[in-house]
Swiss-Prot record:
SUPFAM superfamilies, per database record: LigB-like
GO MF term set: 3-carboxyethylcatechol 2,3-dioxygenase activity; ferrous iron binding
Enzyme class: oxidoreductase
Pfam family, one: LigB
Active site: residue positions: H115 (proton donor), H179 (proton acceptor)
Gene name as annotated: mhpB
NCBIfam families: PRK13370.1-1, PRK13370.1-4
Lineage: Bacteria, Pseudomonadati, Pseudomonadota, Gammaproteobacteria, Enterobacterales
Enzyme Commission designation: 1.13.11.16
Family: Belongs to the LigB/MhpB extradiol dioxygenase family.
Identification of the protein by name: 2,3-dihydroxyphenylpropionate/2,3-dihydroxicinnamic acid 1,2-dioxygenase
Catalytic activity of the protein: 3-(2,3-dihydroxyphenyl)propanoate + O2 = (2Z,4E)-2-hydroxy-6-oxonona-2,4-dienedioate + H(+); (2E)-3-(2,3-dihydroxyphenyl)prop-2-enoate + O2 = (2Z,4E,7E)-2-hydroxy-6-oxonona-2,4,7-trienedioate + H(+)
Keyword list, A-Z: Aromatic hydrocarbons catabolism, Dioxygenase, Iron, Oxidoreductase
Species whose genome carries this gene: Escherichia coli (strain K12)
Functional pathway: Aromatic compound metabolism; 3-phenylpropanoate degradation
Length: 314
């Protein structure tokens, strides 16, 4: 069967701190084109690789990877909220297959996800509940982090499993590219924030969540005025990364350490490993070709914003 892939940056700042209208129109046009290609492909199953931002995963237990056998989106920053339509038996079978391949994949029957999962489902499929989905969390902010090699191997294992299903499979990668928004770090946290990072942040009071979101919005507004206030975006790195993906050279990223990536492009750039997993997964279906490449640094969203598709040729 055929597979399709789309990788897309996300940002909680969409609708809160937007770029100029012509830039917004350009991005919306790119997303609309991707949505049309996906609709024409008519996926029967979605595999969504996405990170979390201390909304569902915390330091009480922080796996490098987790497959949601059941998952609910919390609706942060106005994103879609509700249950994801996870096919339970298929998710369980996927977990067993990945474990048998040598990848230690955690599972959750009550996974809580945020805008990192919700935005691609909203933007590209029209909602959370349009197509059965296997949601796969890849830790992109909480050290210690998985590396490129292990993430690639995860994607390959999931790709091999889904290639046996006789279904049209859509792989989505959500996140990146270069960026470093204000995300708390356990080593630097005060007592209150440490408690939140250790797990109490899963059920934040509405007032505290609003303050947290406002801090991110304020940081974006300052970044637009002075891009020295946060780690700068890195368009050169972002475009080199996208070229590696298009050329099927993702294995070369194995040599890039987590420390190097943080220094080059920002501490939240590790979200690009969702793209690596997606491209590794589609490779299990045979030959593919990329299409629809788009990139633009968007300070208002604190992101090097990228969009890239691929389709199998067999």
């Amino acid at each position: 069967m055929h597979a399709y892939l789309h990788c897309l940056s996300h940002s909680p700042l969409v609708g809160y701190v937007d770029p100029a209208q012509e830039v917004l129109d350009e991005v919306n046009g790119v997303i609309a084109s991707a949505r049309e290609r996906i609709a024409a492909f008519s996926p029967e199953l979605v595999v969504l690789f996405a990170p979390d931002h201390y909304n569902g995963f915390f330091y009480d237990v922080m796996p490098p990877f987790c497959l949601g056998v059941g998952a609910t989106a919390i609706g942060d920053f106005g994103s879609a909220a509700g249950e994801l339509p996870v096919p339970v038996e298929l998710a369980e079978a996927c977990a067993h297959a990945v474990m048998k391949s040598g990848i230690d994949l955690a599972v959750s029957y009550c996974m809580q996800v945020d805008h990192g999962f919700a935005q691609p489902l909203e933007f590209l499929l029209g909602g959370l509940d349009k197509v059965p989905v296997l949601p796969v969390f890849i830790n992109g902010v909480a050290t210690p982090l998985p590396g490129f090699q292990r993430t690639r191997m995860l994607g390959e294992a999931i790709g091999r499993f889904t290639s046996t299903l006789n279904k049209r499979v859509l792989f989505l990668g959500s996140g990146g590219l270069s960026h470093q928004p204000p995300v708390p770090e356990l080593a630097k946290a005060d007592a209150h924030m440490r408690d939140r990072l250790l797990g109490s942040g899963k059920d934040l009071p509405a007032s505290e969540r609003e303050l947290r979101q406002q801090r991110v919005i304020s940081a974006a507004e300052k970044f637009v005025e002075d891009q020295r206030t946060l780690h700068p975006l890195n368009p050169i790195w972002d475009n080199q990364f996208m070229t590696l993906l298009e050329q099927g050279r993702i294995q070369e990223l194995d040599a890039v350490s987590n420390e190097e990536l943080s220094a080059i492009a920002g501490k939240s750039t590790h979200e690009i490993k969702t793209w690596v997993a997606a491209f590794a997964a589609i490779s299990a279906f045979g030959n593919w070709r990329s299409e629809g490449r788009y990139y633009r640094p968007i300070p208002e969203w604190i992101a090097g914003f990228g969009s890239l598709s691929a389709r199998t040729e067999n």
